[in-house]
Amino acid sequence: MIINESYLNVADNSGAKLLRVIRVMGGSRRKWGTVGDVVVCSVRDAVPNGDLKKGDVVKAVIVRTKKEIRRPDGTYIRFDDNAAVVLDKYNEPKGTRVFGPVAKELREKGFMKIVSLAPEVF
């Protein structure tokens, strides 16, 4: 569960390294987000000479959470960290690579480009 003020690792090569959630998108009273949800974030740490700088406001999609996700078949999956992929204004990934595994729930939410770039889909 990702709420406001949560920190997310960045799982792509967009130039950001750490994000802080400002708002979970999808409704005015939305309390938390999970895998596949879009969040508005502030860049808290960035690589030198990258496209994104500290303080930039970006949209990102959550790709991994430490809180387990229940699937329709009754199984659960969880990851070792909370991570997101930075998006551009067309909801496409800003980077050209995705690091680490992603959940297959992204495919159902329509983020096919991220699924195809990921090395593993669980």
UniProtKB/Swiss-Prot annotation:
GO CC, any one term: cytosolic large ribosomal subunit
Superkingdom of source: Bacteria
Keyword Endoplasmic reticulum among record annotations: no
PROSITE patterns in alphabetical order: RIBOSOMAL_L14
Coiled coil regions in record: none
UniProt KW keywords: Ribonucleoprotein, Ribosomal protein, RNA-binding, rRNA-binding
Pfam families, alphabetized: Ribosomal_L14
Family indicated by similarity: Belongs to the universal ribosomal protein uL14 family.
Quaternary data: Part of the 50S ribosomal subunit. Forms a cluster with proteins L3 and L19. In the 70S ribosome, L14 and L19 interact and together make contacts with the 16S rRNA in bridges B5 and B8.
Descriptive protein name: Large ribosomal subunit protein uL14
Source organism per UniProt: Thermosipho africanus (strain TCF52B)
